[in-house]
Amino acid sequence: SNFNKEQMEEILSICEVRPTVLQTELHPYHQEKELKAFLKENGMVAQSWYPLGHGDKALLEEPLFAELGKKYGKSSAQVILRWHIQDGNIVIPGSKNPTHIQANFDLFDFALTDEEMDKIAAMNKNARYYTSTPEMLKRYAETVPPVDEQK
């Protein structure tokens, strides 16, 4: 997860089993259009990590989402999740709140127009909430899950 295009090219050049999904940070402030185009060209899809911008109030309180929420009778979070779906992202939002979990399923009785999708596309700032470092990647690579203990 969280690989960039260059890292994915390297993986594809040496892997025996091709990945089909890349989990990466995606939300209206960080849309990764170039990476997603590369994934599509290579038969892969993106799964959105931090689909609601890590709960950033600035994103959730964007006037456009309030306006669209009012139009469709939805919350800003539901509008953002609908954008993900229409933009081709796999989206699995997390919540411990039963009301939010139910609301996360209530996305299929409306669709954003092309113009609305374009307005959201214009919000892209290439702003990440998570940045990995070489040290972190090394730690992840060295992690050995306790598979034998799980038997």
Question: How should each PLM-predicted stretch be described?
Answer:
Residues 1-151:
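Beta/alpha (TIM)-barrel catalytic core signal, keyed to glycine-rich beta->alpha loops juxtaposed to Asp/Glu
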